[in-house]
Design a protein with these regions (language model features):
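C-terminal catalytic histidine-bearing segment of alpha/beta-hydrolase fold enzymes
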Residues: 209, 214-246
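N-terminal Lys/Arg-rich, disordered targeting/topogenic segments
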Residues: 1-12
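A conserved short beta-strand
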Residues: 145-161
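Alpha/beta-hydrolase active-site loop
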Residues: 70, 96-118, 123-125, 133-137
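Short, surface-exposed "cap/lid" segments of acyl-processing enzymes
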Residues: 36-83, 87-91
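The feature captures the conserved acid-bearing segment of alpha/beta-hydrolase catalytic domains
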Residues: 157-213, 217
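Hydrophobic membrane-insertion alpha-helices, especially the h-region
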Residues: 13-31
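Catalytic nucleophile serine of serine hydrolases
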Residues: 128-130, 157
């Protein structure tokens, strides 16, 4: 008697499709949570100790948004030290492709929020990964008068090139870069700059930068810095506490 060996295949195929659907729904749900579908751009962390004697902080998140990754953890640590912090959800703002001029406007708006929140006229700008790329690209387009409130700029694991769009395609490394990073980053000669990279990181902008106003910091790990938000916060703090020299 010949057995029908094919009768269970549809069931296995259906199970495979169901699993794939669950994975896709999970990914979509994650991106909705992270902010790909237009969550609020800004998140404000007020501080009781805020005032004119200390700067406020603006943090541009990486391409996974300001709800996950290092940005919310570092922001919480800095806020616990008494700094008012405004985080920017780069995933939400840059989910459509933007320009350097639009990035500059975003930074300017975040600065105004931070100054009001921190009751101060000085800000420190921090960019994480994709946010670091957008930070130096935007600052290159910012008018001189708007730069006066910036005490320091911190670029955390910036890349060798720039893409003005945050998306799953960009995250997977499948998007064609829009520009090299060095031409705009090297224009940050008017403000103290800190460039932080992972010691095992490839494709980092930091080794390419060479300016007298630049401080370089190597931390253990690759692009994700071993997820050590305490070490990253410690590397950022000197840029915050040191007064800007005119």
């Amino acid at each position: 008697m010949i057995k029908d060996t094919n009768r269970y295949r549809p069931a296995r195929g259906t199970a495979g499709l169901a699993l794939l659907l669950l994975i896709l729904l999970g990914c979509a749900g994650y991106y909705v949570y992270a902010g790909y579908y237009r969550h609020d751009i800004f998140r404000e962390l007020p501080a009781a100790d805020a005032g004119p004697e200390r700067p406020a902080i603006v943090m541009l998140s990486g391409d996974m948004g300001n709800r996950v990754g290092m940005t919310p953890k570092v922001a919480a640590r800095l806020n616990a030290r008494g700094y008012a912090v405004v985080t920017v959800n780069s995933l939400s703002f840059f989910s459509p492709r933007r320009t350097a001029t639009e990035a500059a406007a975003l930074i300017g708006g975040a600065m105004h929020r931070a100054e009001a929140l921190g009751k101060t006229s000085e800000v420190v700008l921090i960019g994480q990964s994709f946010g670091a790329d957008m930070l130096h690209a935007g600052l290159a387009e910012m008018p001189t008068a708007a730069r006066r409130q910036i005490r320091a700029v911190v670029l955390v694991v910036p890349g060798h090139d720039i893409i003005f769009r945050a998306s799953p395609i960009e995250l997977a490394g499948l998007e064609t870069p829009d520009a090299l990073a060095l031409p705009t980053a090297s224009r940050l000669t008017w403000v103290p700059v800190t460039c932080i990279r992972g010691a095992g990181e490839d494709n980092s902008l930091c080794p390419e930068m060479d300016m007298p106003n630049l401080r370089k910091v190597d931390l253990p790990g690759g692009h994700r810095l071993n997820g050590d938000d305490a070490a990253l916060t410690a590397a950022i703090l000197p840029a915050i506490v040191q007064p800007r020299s005119e």
